[in-house]
Amino acid sequence: MRYALGVEYDGSEFQGWQQLGEHGGPSVQATLQAALSSVADAPIQVVCAGRTDAGVHGECQVVHFDSDARREPRGWMLGTTARLPPSVAVRWCVPAAEDFHARFSARARRYRYRLLNRQIRPALYRQTLSWERRPLDAQAMHTAAQALLGENDFGAFRSVQCQALHARRNLQAITVQRLGEVVEVQVQANAFLHHMVRNIVGSLILVGTGEQPIDWIATLLAGRDRTVAGPTAPPQGLVFIGPLYPAEWHLPAEVTQ
């Protein structure tokens, strides 16, 4: 039987979502699979909606897995969470259709990036906020970001290690707003390239400080040259909010579009 899980995690202590082999360091995937396998008393492999890098967090990562073990969804949720470290929790578990796929059934994916914008670095939230001491104009950043909307080649914002066959993605929404001392960027797209959100944020920061004009983001997009764009923003400010699926899959409302 196939199940879908909603998983929350603090990525600070992990080398990313993906299991990288015996000597690749701790991963969220390996940690979750070990807990699920313990509940099932059999090996379990999971497939996720979107992989995250080292230090990046997950608010509602969606995974699917198959198991013949006779467990109720509540049993999977509570039993697995009891076997996980404090940094990982299963938020929900539901039966899924046999043809549901956590990655390929998703219609969109959403990320949030938060910057603490003040002179003094964060102490309490240093693992979940990035930090920029220079004053940022969030409205200028928001205006500049609108140039990225639509289906475009995001070559200027892809990592040099990106293994995607092409850089075309459909960016469906992007907002930048100030919430007190925090500047928050939210992005939704059909899919993302490696480091795409962090590279976009790194370039938007230069607009926010006034080092670059508002139309610079449009120029970068058209030029498709990663070497002239801004630096990659640090990982700790990034959260994978989660994917969005069509209602036909009957998943919880927070991941249904």
From Swiss-Prot:
Keywords: Isomerase, tRNA processing. CDD domains: PseudoU_synth_EcTruA. The keyword Transcription does not apply. It catalyses: uridine(38/39/40) in tRNA = pseudouridine(38/39/40) in tRNA. It is an enzyme of class 5 (isomerase). The active site is at D53. Substrate binds at Y111. One of its GO terms (biological process) is tRNA pseudouridine synthesis. It comes from the Bacteria. Its EC number is 5.4.99.12. GO terms for molecular function: pseudouridine synthase activity; RNA binding; tRNA pseudouridine(38-40) synthase activity. Belongs to the tRNA pseudouridine synthase TruA family. HAMAP family: TruA (MF_00171). Homodimer. Formation of pseudouridine at positions 38, 39 and 40 in the anticodon stem and loop of transfer RNAs. This is tRNA pseudouridine synthase A. The lineage of its organism: Bacteria, Pseudomonadati, Pseudomonadota, Gammaproteobacteria, Lysobacterales. The gene is truA.
